[in-house]
Design a protein with these regions (language model features):
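Outer membrane beta-barrel
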Residues: 74-76, 98-109, 121-253, 270-286, ...
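N-terminal secretory signal peptides that target proteins for export/translocation
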Residues: 1-28
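Sequence/structural signature of outer-membrane beta-barrel proteins
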Residues: 105-111, 151-157, 173, 188-192, ...
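Outer-membrane beta-barrel "beta-signal"
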Residues: 62, 413-419, 459-473
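Detector for outer-membrane/organellar transmembrane beta-barrel domains
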Residues: 286-421, 426
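The canonical Cys-X-X-Cys-His
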Residues: 61-70
Length: 473
């Protein structure tokens, strides 16, 4: 199997995954220092440098106004409107909107891994600082704003660019319809999305980077994160109908190296990859509902010196439901299904796949209940199935498949406590903290429940308990 084919399979995680950092693995303490020193100086010199509390200070609203659970990726209707309108609401007052975030925790798996998941770590029972991120988040001009993230990975010990979403937005009346329209420049298909049902900002919002994860997932589910640059035009009509269309292009080895992603992570995207999104949303009383579709068509060259291509056509459908009561109860549910058609002419000709035509299907569902934005519990279900292919999915300890099947199925159970980051919290909006315990269980892993890898490992051996903290300033 070629390195490029491996990269696409490994980087395309549906669930679980870590959404904030997907850079290539490096080992550099110096890069951490180079990142932290100017960031700390900026934070200390600016009274407005806060969590993406920088958004909270700009708008004059608490983080909980935009986020369903005090703070984090999950957005309320207000949060979606703030993003839709280009991150410009409020008065930034001429200050620089900086923020920072730290995530870490303890990872325990049911059975030790054969090899350590990263340098400087053990095969089990690992304590880690997973991410230290710096942000620019807020208004640039009256009609443009940005969300820019740079992350140091505690596992890789390397700094890289992370999520990027730069927007320009305007509003207008066309006949009897009100329209918000705009442009987004971003570096990951679905990172610009307004909903938490799509891969870019979907559950789980935090996972261990040191635990085993299934080998297969559609390329739209993180396969191109921080490896491409794209632009899309969008419009929201009457706050109901959302339409978006755009395209992505791969970055050169030179730029990937400069940005910290690494030239060895290049998926070798051939030409432009079109992306589309459509969604219908509505509020009714204390409830909110949306249903939509999105997709991506892309061509890759596993061997950049060859004209032969692999094609990936992803088509997805998603839905979101939210309910909030005056008594402090909140409920949210997200559903997502992706079908990927794979035409692997280049990989098949090179002997890296057993078939020239494969497919993958993924289904995810998560339901969250929160009380007073303090106690939060979530259950998530995930299922991946697809074509058996001994070329793509070969036997190997822990990460391999004896049957050549990508099928994986399981659940995520999450319990969180949020002492800071709410409407009435101490030092709002500067101080934000959530702590939690997350358990990931596997019923199938890479094709089977028992001896899935050909070396005696069971799917349940990868069950993971992750105790974490998530701090934003």
């Amino acid at each position: 199997m070629s390195d490029n084919t491996k990269m696409i399979r490994v980087r395309s995680k549906i669930y679980p995954r870590q959404i904030y950092f997907r850079g290539a693995r490096r080992n550099s303490v110096a890069s951490f220092a180079a990142f932290l020193v100017p960031l700390a100086a900026a934070l200390l010199s600016s009274r407005t440098a806060q969590a993406l509390p920088s958004f909270a200070q700009q708008t004059g609203k608490p983080c909980a106004q935009c986020h369903t659970v005090a703070y984090g990726p999950a957005l309320t209707s207000y949060g979606r409107q703030f993003k839709l309108n280009g991150y410009v609401w409020g008065d930034v007052g001429g200050s620089v909107p900086l923020a920072m975030m730290v995530q870490g925790g303890f990872t325990y798996t049911s059975k030790d891994q054969v090899d350590a998941p990263a340098p400087h770590f053990a095969t089990n029972d690992n304590l880690s600082v997973d991410q230290v991120s710096g942000f620019f988040g807020g208004r640039i001009t009256a009609h443009s704003g940005a969300f820019v993230q740079v992350t140091y990975s505690g596992e890789d010990r390397h700094t890289s660019w992370d999520n990027l979403d730069i927007r320009y937005a305007r509003s207008a009346s066309i006949g009897n319809d009100s329209v918000v329209f705009g442009l987004s420049v971003n570096n990951n298909p679905t990172v610009q999305d307004l909903w938490n049902s799509t891969p870019g900002w979907g559950f789980p919002y935090i996972t261990s980077a040191l635990a085993p994860t299934p080998a297969a997932g559609p390329v739209i589910a993180g396969g191109f994160a921080q490896l491409v640059l794209g632009a899309s035009a969008y419009a929201m009509v009457d706050d109901h109908l959302y339409l978006e269309a755009g395209a992505y292009r791969g970055l050169s080895n030179r730029w990937l190296s400069r940005l910290g992603a690494g030239a060895d992570s290049n998926p070798n995207m051939d030409g432009l990859s079109p992306y589309w999104r459509a969604d219908w949303q509505m509020d009714f009383g204390a409830s909110y509902f949306s249903v939509g579709t999105y997709g991506l068509n892309t061509k890759l060259r596993p061997d950049p010196l060859s004209a032969m291509e692999d094609r990936f056509n992803d088509l997805a459908f998603d839905a979101t439901y939210q309910y909030t009561s005056d008594a402090g109860h909140a409920l949210a549910a997200n559903f997502n299904v992706i079908h990927e058609k794979q035409s692997l002419d280049a990989s098949f000709a090179a002997g890296n796949s057993a078939s020239s035509t494969d497919h993958l299907n993924t289904v995810t569902l998560d339901v969250t209940y929160a009380y007073q934005q303090t106690w939060v519990t979530t259950i998530g279900l995930f299922d991946t199935s697809g074509s058996t292919d001994m070329g793509l999915y070969a036997p190997a300890p822990v990460s391999g498949s004896l049957s050549g099947s990508p099928d994986s199925r399981g659940y995520v159970l999450l319990l969180e406590y949020i002492p800071f980051g709410k409407l009435d919290s101490f030092a709002r909006p500067w101080l934000n903290l959530r702590v939690g315990i997350e358990y990931t269980g596997y019923q199938r892993f890479n094709g089977a429940g028992a001896n899935y890898d050909g070396f005696g490992r069971s799917a349940s051996d990868n069950n993971t308990l992750f105790g974490f903290f998530w701090f934003a300033l």
